[in-house]
Structure formats: structure tokens, C-alpha cells
Amino acid sequence: MTQQEMKKIAAQAALQFVKPDTIVGVGSGSTVNCFIDALASMKDQIKGAVAASKASEGRLRAIGIEVFNANEVSELDVYIDGADEITPQGAMIKGGGAALTREKIVSSLAKKFVCIVDGSKQVDVLGTTFPLPVEVIPMARSYVARQLVALGGSPEYREGVVTDNGNVILDVHNFHIIEPLKMEHTINNIAGVVTNGIFAQRYANVTIVGTPEGAKIIE
């Protein structure tokens, strides 16, 4: 079974967490694209969605789902998103698609975060397989990079990428993130950092793993 097929299995299983007459929080990325495609079957049962990226917003509108601005809602019932890495405790690294700040905003509005992944994204310690993305205000790029080196990381400027917010991304290699919540706060306190891709304060309440045997749900 291909990775794409396992993503589709996880995405389809996430529909059970979408309640009728609600506004759904929708993340971004390849697994979320599978979820949006699956959500088309429920488009007449939900009020609409809040999207964490312009790409997801466009995909939702293309299938006829109304998209709301995050400022128009006070709370979401559920937020569905993927991850680049996720631990058994539900802490994640996200931001491979550079939408991490908006993903943090929309996920913070939700009562429940459902993370949909294939098995390759499961790790015991964050930083094992994927660098940590950090969104940075452009004028602070060099300063922030030096601070990340001081923390033990090896930051790499993501060439040619500008976020939906007009900022740049540093991908930090060589982090072995034993205490995700502490590291999330430490990096966010560096002047010029908009946010980083550790999702530990807003962790996943439910993880759905697509496997050849079907969807495995971890709560």
C-alpha cells in the first residue's frame, strides 16, 4: 500500500469527528488535501470551514464549502490537520508547508485537534526525522539564526519561500526535542520569531494513523 493510500485512509476516518451544523477547522498539506476531498461528501451537512492556508481555502471553495475568517468564529468544534512528526503524547512538528502560524491560530480555536498521518510520521522524540521550521520576520533572520545555533540547532534558510504572512522560514536541524513544551516557549521568546513548528501547547487530542490494516485511532 502506498503512502498516499494510507493518507486517504486516515483522512476518511477523520470524518467521524465532524459534527453536522458546525464550522470545521482545516489545516494544510497533502494529507489535509485528502481530508478536504473526503469532506466533499458532507458539504451539505456542515456550515463551513476555517482554513489555515490560502491553498486549503481555495480547495475548500472549489468543492463548494463556505470558508470563514478566523475572526468570525469564537470557537471550533474540531480542527483536522496533518503533521511532519508526532509523538505518542500528541506533540507534533508541523510547518513543512510553511503554514505553521495560521495552523497554530486555527487549532487554538478548536475544542479538539485531530491529527491525520501515515505511519512514517510517528516518532518517539521530535526532531528525529524532520527539521524544525521557525517562521521569522525577515529583518530578524540572521539574529534568530544565531540564537538557534546557541540552542544547539543548525538553521537553514528555506530559499524562495515566503509565508502567507510575508515572512521567511528557517529549518532547524540537529534538534533532539526531549521537552517539546519548554522548547516551544524558549524559541517563541526569541525576538523576531513569529512562531515555531512545535505543537506541544496545542497538542493533538486524537491521532489517526492510516495503515494497510485500516485507520488506527489513538486518543
Curated annotation (Swiss-Prot):
Pathway field: Carbohydrate degradation; pentose phosphate pathway; D-ribose 5-phosphate from D-ribulose 5-phosphate (non-oxidative stage): step 1/1
Phylogenetic placement of the source organism: Bacteria, Pseudomonadati, Pseudomonadota, Gammaproteobacteria, Pasteurellales
Enzyme class, UniProt record, top EC level: isomerase
Keyword terms of this UniProt record: Isomerase
Catalytic activity: aldehydo-D-ribose 5-phosphate = D-ribulose 5-phosphate
InterPro entries: NagB/RpiA_transferase-like, Ribose5P_isomerase_typA_subgr, Ribose5P_isomerase_type_A
Name of the protein: Ribose-5-phosphate isomerase A
EC number(s) given by UniProt: 5.3.1.6
Gene Ontology, cellular component aspect: cytosol
Subunit structure, as described in the record: Homodimer.
ATP-binding in keyword set: no
GO function term, MF aspect, one: ribose-5-phosphate isomerase activity
Function per UniProt: Catalyzes the reversible conversion of ribose-5-phosphate to ribulose 5-phosphate.
Family in the record: Belongs to the ribose 5-phosphate isomerase family.
Matching HAMAP family: Rib_5P_isom_A (MF_00170)
Keyword Isomerase appears in the UniProt entry: yes
Residues reported to bind substrate: S28, G29, S30, T31, D81, G82, A83, D84, K94, G95, G96, G97, K121
Organism from which the protein derives: Actinobacillus pleuropneumoniae serotype 3 (strain JL03)
Pfam families (alphabetical): Rib_5-P_isom_A
Annotated active site: E103
GO biological process: D-ribose metabolic process; pentose-phosphate shunt, non-oxidative branch
